[in-house]
A protein has these predicted regions:
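A generic structural motif
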Residues: 1-3, 46-52, 106-108
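Catalytic-histidine neighborhood of serine endopeptidases
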Residues: 2-44, 54-55, 65
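Active-site loop architecture of trypsin-fold serine endopeptidases
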Residues: 5-17, 57-59, 77-90, 96-118, ...
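Conserved hydrophobic positions within beta-strands
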Residues: 36-38, 92, 121, 187
Length: 190
C-alpha cells in the first residue's frame, strides 16, 4: 500500500521493526482496524510503502502518467475531512508544475482536501496516474498530484526497507531538452 509520508510520519519509529499504532480500514468494513507496518519511506519525495496483511478485492494497475495531457479526465479517491470513500472528478489542468522539491507535478481541478493526500489519482481506465497531495489552503481549488513515474522509480528502494535519503550538492536544476530530446542538466540556482 502506497501513501504520502506526511500522512504517517508521526507514527514512524525507525528503531521499531514490528507493527505500530498504524492501521488501515477498508471501505467495505470501516469498523475493523487492520494493523499495518511501514516498510520504507522517503520524506523528500513524501512517499511511504506500507505492508498490510490482507488480500484486497481490487488492486489498481499503475498507469503511465507521461502520456497525460491538459484536459484529460481524472478522479481522486480519498477521505476528505473524514468523509470516507469519496471520489471526486476533474481534469489535468497542467502537466508540469514545479512547486515542490519533488520536481514536476500535475495540477488538477478535482476537489481535494487534506484527507485526499496519499490517495490515488486515477484515469478513466482505472489506472493510477498520480498520488494526490492536498492543495494550498490559501488558494482554494489549486490542487496537485505527483506523477506515478516518481513512484515507479522509488518503489524498488521502498521495498528494500527503511528510510531513503537524498544527497544535496548545493544546486538545483532540471533536465535540459531540445525538441523533446534530453541533452543534459540545466542548473537553475546554486
Amino acid at each position: 500500500l502506497v501513501t504520502k509520508y506526511h500522512v504517517i510520519s508521526n507514527l514512524v519509529d525507525p528503531k521499531y521493526k514490528g507493527y505500530s499504532r498504524l492501521y488501515v480500514k477498508l471501505p467495505s468494513d470501516m469498523e475493523t482496524k487492520i494493523p499495518a507496518k511501514v516498510i520504507g519511506y522517503d520524506s523528500t519525495l513524501d512517499l511511504a510503502l506500507l505492508k498490510v496483511e490482507i488480500t484486497p478485492d481490487f488492486v489498481f494497475e499503475l498507469g503511465s502518467s507521461k502520456d497525460l495531457v491538459v484536459g484529460d479526465k481524472v478522479s481522486a479517491i480519498g477521505t476528505p475531512i473524514g468523509l470516507e470513500g469519496t471520489l471526486t472528478a476533474g481534469i489535468i489542468s497542467a502537466v508540469s508544475r514545479e512547486i515542490t522539491n519533488v520536481g514536476h507535478v500535475f495540477q488538477i481541478d478535482a476537489a481535494v482536501n487534506s484527507g485526499n493526500s496519499g490517495g490515488p489519482l486515477i484515469d478513466e481506465n482505472r489506472r493510477v496516474q498520480a498520488i494526490v497531495f492536498a492543495g494550498m489552503l490559501q488558494f482554494q481549488g489549486l490542487n496537485f498530484a505527483i506523477p506515478v513515474e516518481y513512484l515507479k522509480q522509488i518503489l524498488p528502494l521502498l521495498y528494500q526497507g527503511g528510510e531513503i535519503t537524498h544527497s544535496w550538492t548545493g544546486t538545483y536544476g532540471h533536465t535540459y531538452k531540445v525538441k523533446n530530446q534530453k541533452k543534459g542538466v540545466e542548473i537553475q540556482y546554486v
